[in-house]
């Protein structure tokens, strides 16, 4: 400020820099109370958007000039040619209430936006870096989707005729405005690869990949790990990888897992968006015990940067339930490898034949393997548990002889890659955006075609759930996913082959917020009813929109349409035994859709997949996925700082006079005195609800989730002192037919809501009391985010 002392004018850039420093100090001050002060949290977020907005280009022309070398040619040209109109559209949006909501999601939302999602001119985001603003990011995405519509006439025609209202959408700006409004209002959130890379040159937009490589020899194993896996990790996406056929000349599977682990760690070095691999193995493999031990804390060479999953045949569960001392036999893939292709009765028959002829490598009591499985779960939070019978019985085509025994990184996408590489293409609907003031818009009608709202809450008569908005969101998600499939780059030839099946996965976020805003608890009967209706409508609308791409747009059905169950008119929910009288949507509408689908086909092979959404839920400030609230106050810890993560829906309803007591108990409603506990009962967390009830709720929505759901166990520390408790949950999930019986096991310590850790269990799953069977874990306590997994951001691709 020497110039000022000499009476000289201060340069504008110096004044702005000093103002930014002052604002950052104010932000740091507000962050201290952001956990309990809703306005402080919102103000900190607004100010952070303001500060970072100064580092963004001033208008669209300046944006294209700054980032033009990164933009795909068509997107570059569209933004440049329509710059003035786009500026006007963005300005109108900024002057409306939706922009205020966008920048008022809190400090964590703003930090996440600029740390992870927006473009910058310097990868590290240095002092001189120029950033996209939030609206410029959404404009880039909208421009990409618009360009794909004009590149693919079927997409353009469908969007124009279905979304055009009384008149068709004709100009590029019409399409841009349609996509921009949905994205910027956060009605639909795309997966992280799309948010970061849509519209860029040579952009990888797939969320996750699934591999089933041949690992029967040393050469083939090395080829799978270095030739096939490496390009997928370098594309910054997560991978699900089947290891069931690993034999590799007698080598130990842990050495293979360490190879994979090292690749993941290398790719994550200096990487803004960490990636990982979920390795899957079936329970009959001769090295299953070594596989389960690969991540245990007592293993000096544990593979802490990857994840594991097991696929369990129904036969194992039945043997265990009949007699835990029954012998379970393990096989070499060279002898029993064909078991991998079988499920149900065919698996049972072949397993029995191999045992009868003494072709097994070894055997052990079923309870010993169950204990090894549960011990790994309690110590590490995984492996994921898939039901082999369920994922194959309910798959979109018959898999007997080539059965599926693996999933993607977050266990919600189930596909058969054959000798190629399957791809996940994801988006999620922000369900609270479907709430509206009662009486607005259409009246009640048939759920499939004009249902106005679901009126469930006399306690909060000002809000109702609008199925019109939900259907519009699902249609938009279908268009965006298909634009990403058609316009993205495939990292390997195998990915390109499987993209022809055009598998889509539409999920949700904010389900718990919807129930709370309607004045209901997560487990209330009315909430359960709305839960099932939401996913029925989503499945119906996704199939219908995909069918319209064929009937309206003239696109061909996906590559494997003739082999699909839908080609025979079989909806996913019918394989669950669901009858018309239990459905929300009228029978006539389902039958009309069946007729159209059978006659014309669908553009996509799959439709609904419920992913975790941990990343995009931070952008919106909503609860994750379909889960109950995880905590009412927690924090997000990164290598830079700790940012408070309050439950915004909770804070909006907290009386100021109740804050001291709520703060004393860390927002834990279950610890409040009875009157206050009753007042805030709608904000109980996932740890407060019965895990059995959560499993039943997951089973109730399963008929409408044609892929799977990242269903997790939320357990209190006292529960896992008895391994039999976890065992019973697994058996219940199997009995109710869940495809993903368990994605992750989160354990809440009794001492503190925000200090969670994995525990060590040393008692048998068949001992009931667990007395003396538990010892404290030797890992340090973790924040809520770190309780979920060792690498909390590893599933950004799915979010």
UniProtKB/Swiss-Prot annotation:
Enzyme class per UniProt: oxidoreductase
Site (Important for electron transfer): 743-744
Site location (Important for hydrogen atom transfer): 208, 424
Family matches, as InterPro entries: HSV_RIR1, NrdE_NrdA_C, RNR_lg_C, RNR_lsu_N, Rrm1
Residues that, per the record, bind substrate: 192, 207-208, 238, 408-412, 612-616
Family: Belongs to the ribonucleoside diphosphate reductase large chain family.
UniProt-listed HAMAP family: HSV_RIR1
Assembly, per entry: Heterotetramer composed of a homodimer of the large subunit (R1) and a homodimer of the small subunit (R2). Larger multisubunit protein complex are also active, composed of (R1)n(R2)n.
Protein known as: Ribonucleoside-diphosphate reductase large subunit
Organism from which the protein derives: Equine herpesvirus 2 (strain 86/87) (EHV-2)
Gene of this entry: RIR1
């Amino acid at each position: 400020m020497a110039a000022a002392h000499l009476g000289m004018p201060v340069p504008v850039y110096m004044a702005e820099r000093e103002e930014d420093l002052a604002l950052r100090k104010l932000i740091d001050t507000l962050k201290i109370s952001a956990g309990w002060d809703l306005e402080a949290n919102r103000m900190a977020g607004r100010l952070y958007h303001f500060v970072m907005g100064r580092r963004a280009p001033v208008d669209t022309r300046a944006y294209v000039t700054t980032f033009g070398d990164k933009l795909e040619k068509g997107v570059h040209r569209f933004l440049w040619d329509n710059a003035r109109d786009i500026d006007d559209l963005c300005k109108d949006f900024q002057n409306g209430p939706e922009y205020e909501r966008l920048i008022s999601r809190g400090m964590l939302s703003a930090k996440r936006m600029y740390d992870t999602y927006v473009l910058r001119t310097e990868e590290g985001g240095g002092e001189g870096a120029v950033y996209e603003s939030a609206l410029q990011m959404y404009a880039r995405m909208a421009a990409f989707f618009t360009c794909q519509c004009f590149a693919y006439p079927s997409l353009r025609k469908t969007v124009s005729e279905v979304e055009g209202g009384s008149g068709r959408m004709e100009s590029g700006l019409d399409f841009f405005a349609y996509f921009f409004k949905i994205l910027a209002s956060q009605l639909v959130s795309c997966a992280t690869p799309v948010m970061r890379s849509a519209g860029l040159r040579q952009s990888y937009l797939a969320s996750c990949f699934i591999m089933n490589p041949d690992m029967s020899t040393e050469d083939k194993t090395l080829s799978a790990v270095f030739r096939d896996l490496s390009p997928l990790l370098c594309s910054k996406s997560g991978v699900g990888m089947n290891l069931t056929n690993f034999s590799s000349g007698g080598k130990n599977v842990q050495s293979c897992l360490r190879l994979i682990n090292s690749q993941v760690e290398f790719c994550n070095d200096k990487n803004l968006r960490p990636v990982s691999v979920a390795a899957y193995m079936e329970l009959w493999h001769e090295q299953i015990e070594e596989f389960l031990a690969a991540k245990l804390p007592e293993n000096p060479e544990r593979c802490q940067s990857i994840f594991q999953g097991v696929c369990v045949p129904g036969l194992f569960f039945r043997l265990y339930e009949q007699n835990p001392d029954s012998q379970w036999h393990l096989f070499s893939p060279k002898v029993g490898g064909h078991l991998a292709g079988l499920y149900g009765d065919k698996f049972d028959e072949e397993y029995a034949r191999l045992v009868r002829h003494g072709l097994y490598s070894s055997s052990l009591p079923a309870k010993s393997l169950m204990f090894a499985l549960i011990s790994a779960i309690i110590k590490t939070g995984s492996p994921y548990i898939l039901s082999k019978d369920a994922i194959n019985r309910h798959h979109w085509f018959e898999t007997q002889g080539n059965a599926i025994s693996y999933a993607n990184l977050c266990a919600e996408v189930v596909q058969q890659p054959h000798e190629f590489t399957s791809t996940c293409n994801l988006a999620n609907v922000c369900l609270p955006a479907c709430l509206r003031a009662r009486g607005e818009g259409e009246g009640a009608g048939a759920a499939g075609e004009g249902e106005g709202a679901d009126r469930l809450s006399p306690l909060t008569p000002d809000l109702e759930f609008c199925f019109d908005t939900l259907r519009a969101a699902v249609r938009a998600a279908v268009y965006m996913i298909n634009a990403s499939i058609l316009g993205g780059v495939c990292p390997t030839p195998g990915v390109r082959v499987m993209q022809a099946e055009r598998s889509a996965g539409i999920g949700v976020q904010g389900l718990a917020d919807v129930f709370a805003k309607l004045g209901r608890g997560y487990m209330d009967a009315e909430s359960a009813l709305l839960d099932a209706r939401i996913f029925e409508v989503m499945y119906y609308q996704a199939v219908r929109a995909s069918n319209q791409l064929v009937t309206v747009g003239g696109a061909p059905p996906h590559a494997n349409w003739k082999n699909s169950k839908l080609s025979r008119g079989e909806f996913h929910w019918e394989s669950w035994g669901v009858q018309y009288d239990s459905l929300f949507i009228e029978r006539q509408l389902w039958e009309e859709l069946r007729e159209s689908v059978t006659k014309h086909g669908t553009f996509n092979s799959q439709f609904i997949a419920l992913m975790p959404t941990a990343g995009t839920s931070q952008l919106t400030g909503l609860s994750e996925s379909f889960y109950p609230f995880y905590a009412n106050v927690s924090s997000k810890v990164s290598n830079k700082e700790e940012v408070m993560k309050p439950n915004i829906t909770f804070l909006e309803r907290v009386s100021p006079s109740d804050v001291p007591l709520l703060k004393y108990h860390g927002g834990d409603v279950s610890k409040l005195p009875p009157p206050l506990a009753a007042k805030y009962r709608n904000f109980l967390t996932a740890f407060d609800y019965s895990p059995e009830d959560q499993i039943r709720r997951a089973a109730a929505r399963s008929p409408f989730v044609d892929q799977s759901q990242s269903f997790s166990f939320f357990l209190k520390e006292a529960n896992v002192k008895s391994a039999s408790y976890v065992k019973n949950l697994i058996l219940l999930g199997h009995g109710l037919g869940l495809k993903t019986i368990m994605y992750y096991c989160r354990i809440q310590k009794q001492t503190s809501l925000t200090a969670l850790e994995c525990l060590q269990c040393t008692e048998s799953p068949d001992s009931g009391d667990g007395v003396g069977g538990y010892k404290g874990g030797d890992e340090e306590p973790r924040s809520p985010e770190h309780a979920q997994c060792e690498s909390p951001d590893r599933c950004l691709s799915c979010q």
